[in-house]
Amino acid sequence: MSKIVAVVVLAAFCVAMLVSDVSAKTSISVKGESNVDVVSQINSLVSSIVSGANVSAVLLAQTLVNILQILIDANVFA
């Protein structure tokens, strides 16, 4: 089930990037942490899906939050 959710999240991100003018921002500042490289998070998520491993719910949630933060920063929902 988590693999399906992960694929849907990644597909939604790809569609949002194609439809809107999202900048090439690939890292965001997370409170209490250094910059998070969202591209490496997505690569890790895709690798987990392709290898057939269970997708960590924490990784999925963090990736989704970071993708949403980039989309919000780019005013996609405005």
UniProtKB/Swiss-Prot annotation:
<comment type="function">
    <text>Major component of royal jelly, a substance produced in the hypopharyngeal gland containing proteins, free amino acids, fatty acids, sugars and other nutrients, which is fed to developing larvae by worker nurse bees. All larvae are fed some royal jelly early in their development but it forms the principal source of nutrition for larvae destined to become queen bees. May play an important role in honey bee nutrition. However, its role could not only be associated with larval development, because high level of mRNA is found in both forager and nurse honey bees.</text>
</comment>
<feature type="glycosylation site" description="N-linked (GlcNAc...) asparagine">
    <location>
        <position position="54"/>
    </location>
</feature>
<dbReference type="GO" id="GO:0022609">
    <property type="term" value="P:multicellular organism adhesion to substrate"/>
</dbReference>
<dbReference type="GO" id="GO:0005576">
    <property type="term" value="C:extracellular region"/>
</dbReference>
<protein>
    <recommendedName>
        <fullName>Apisimin</fullName>
    </recommendedName>
</protein>
<feature type="signal peptide">
    <location>
        <begin position="1"/>
        <end position="24"/>
    </location>
</feature>
<keyword id="KW-0732">Signal</keyword>
<keyword id="KW-0325">Glycoprotein</keyword>
<dbReference type="GO" id="GO:0032934">
    <property type="term" value="F:sterol binding"/>
</dbReference>
<keyword id="KW-0964">Secreted</keyword>
<comment type="subunit">
    <text>Occurs as monomer and a variety of oligomers. Component of the apisin heterooctamer complex consisting of 4 copies of MRJP1 and 4 copies of apisimin, associated with 8 molecules of 24-methylenecholesterol; apisimin forms a bridge connecting two MRJP1 dimers. At low pH multiple apisin octamers stack to form filaments that increase the viscosity of royal jelly; these filaments may be stabilized by bound fatty acid chains. The mandibular gland, where royal jelly is produced, has low pH conditions favouring filament formation, while the higher pH of the insect midgut favors filament disassembly.</text>
</comment>
